[in-house]
Structures are given as structure tokens and as C-alpha cells.
Amino acid sequence: MGFCLGLQLLFDVSYEYGRHKGLGILPGKVVRFDFADRTVDERPRVPHIGWNQAWQKQPCPMLRGIDNGEYFYFDHSYYVVPDDAHVVAATTDYGLDFASAVWKDNVFATQFHPEKSQAAGLRILENFVGL
């Protein structure tokens, strides 16, 4: 289980402050939000800080009992781009749809912070403990 940077570390490579090798547990990369092609008024603020919705893309035991579109707390400037779309458990829209939760076999991680996400976040932690 990983949160925020813990999610990002699971992937092959990160481009945060250079090019850095990740753990390679999941294939893919970590990139910065880039809204340079939009007008100033259309650009979401980076870092992405605050509450946003997570939309479930597949049944996942860690998301059991969580409403689709539930709000979670985010604080990040980078996001993961998995090579395999089948690992994406949930997505979030912040100027683009990005993977906000991934799940494969016994690996589960979120870009959001369950520990700061009140009842929904506690439910995810309870689901983990209950496995």
C-alpha cells in the first residue's frame, strides 16, 4: 500500500527534478502536470491541493464501500501514467483524467491521501487491515 509519493515510487521512472529510476513494480512513468498550452484563466493550479473526486474504473477490494465519485484529499504536482490501463482502479479529473488509484495483485496505491480524507479515507485503511 502506498500513498502519494508511495504510489509514484512503484513505477519505472519519474521526471520530478530530472530523470529518476523507480521501483519498477508497475510499468509506467511519473510526469508533471503541464498546462502550458492553455490560457492563464484555463490552467488548473499546480500543485493540485485540495478535495477532488475519484471515479472507480474497476472493482477493487480496497475501494469496497466507497461511493463512486467520493471526495479525497490531494496534494501533488506529478501524476502517474501507467503503461497498463488495467491497473487503474480510479481516476480523477484535474484538467485531465489521471490515475488516482492503482491495483494489481497485492499492490494498491493512491495519489490522494487516505489519512487526510476523513471517513472515506478511513474506510480504505479499514479495508486494507481487513485483508
Q: Where are the language model's segments positioned?
A:
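Cysteine-nucleophile active-site neighborhood
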Residues: M1-H48
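Amide-donor transfer/coupling interface in amidating biosynthetic enzymes
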Residues: G28-L131
